[in-house]
Regions:
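Short, Lys/Arg-enriched segments at the junction into DNA-binding effector domains
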Residues: 2-3, 117-133
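Conserved acidic carboxylate
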Residues: 8
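The feature encodes the CheY-like receiver
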Residues: 14, 56, 74, 86, ...
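Acidic, metal-coordinating helix/loop segments flanking the phosphotransfer/catalytic sites
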Residues: 30-48
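Active-site residues of response regulator receiver
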Residues: 52, 82
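C-terminal output helix
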Residues: 106-119
């Protein structure tokens, strides 16, 4: 399955996400700050990132912007996970390049389904590129 980063400062939310993802067969690495996330990204680029918008040391939307501006990471799927529920917040995240935007509280089964759908599309795109080349 996939190698995922869960970037979430709320330990309870992080544990729920990680538990559900691990039970679905994914490998999960958790971190609680932008600083930790950037360190992880230097070590390994994941298959997908679940990213909280409101982190203690850095805005998740700014992290998303950096991910999309970096050639090595611009195609990594990112799901924003946040308590911000206004349409404007969702539109901003999606406009910056988020692949999905999930609001808290969330249903873990729905999150897993969204992740699997995005990973299927990502894998299909990768297979298509291999065939074309």
């Amino acid at each position: 399955m996939a190698y995922l980063y869960v970037v979430e400062d709320d330990k309870n939310i992080s544990e729920i996400e990680s538990f559900a993802l691990k039970n679905a067969g994914h490998t999960v690495v958790e971190c609680a700050s932008g600083k930790e996330f950037h360190k992880l990204m230097r070590d390994r680029i994941p298959d997908m990132i679940l990213l909280d918008v409101m982190l203690p040391d850095e805005d998740g939307l700014e992290i998303l912007r950096k991910i999309r501006q970096t050639p090595e990471t611009r195609r990594v799927p990112v799901i924003m996970v946040t308590a911000k529920t206004t349409e404007l917040d969702k539109v901003k995240g999606l406009d910056l390049g988020a692949d999905d935007y999930i609001t808290k509280p969330f249903n873990p089964l729905e999150v897993i389904a969204n992740i699997n759908a995005i990973l299927r599309r990502t894998n299909l795109n990768n297979q298509t590129k291999e065939i074309v080349i």
